[in-house]
Amino acid sequence: MSRVCELTGARANNGMAVSHSHIRTKKLQQVNLQKRRLWWQEGKKWINIKISTKALKSIQKVGLDKVAKTNGVDLNKF
C-alpha cells in the first residue's frame, strides 16, 4: 500500500537536503502516517484507516464526518 493519507490524500514531498558546505541532494519528506481505529458515530461502527497526524488533529477538532465531507471521502468504503 502506498504512503498516502486515506482521508486527505496527503503524500510525500520532494525536498532538498542542504549540507554545511551547501551541497544539495534530493530527499523525500514522507507524511507522518498512523494506522488508527476510529469510531464513526453516524455509521455506528469502527473504521480502520491510515491517516496523517494532521488529519487526526483535524478530526479531534471538528469531527470525523466533517473532515470526510470536506475532502470528499465516503466512509462506507472502510
Curated annotation (Swiss-Prot):
It comes from the Bacteria. Keywords: Ribonucleoprotein, Ribosomal protein. SUPFAM superfamilies: L28p-like (SSF143800). Signal peptide: none annotated. One of its GO terms (molecular function) is structural constituent of ribosome. GO terms for cellular component: ribonucleoprotein complex; ribosome. InterPro entries: Ribosomal_bL28, Ribosomal_bL28/bL31-like_sf, Ribosomal_bL28_bact-type, Ribosomal_bL28_sf. One of its GO terms (biological process) is translation. NCBIfam families: L28. Belongs to the bacterial ribosomal protein bL28 family. This is Large ribosomal subunit protein bL28. The lineage of its organism: Bacteria, Bacillati, Cyanobacteriota, Cyanophyceae, Synechococcales.
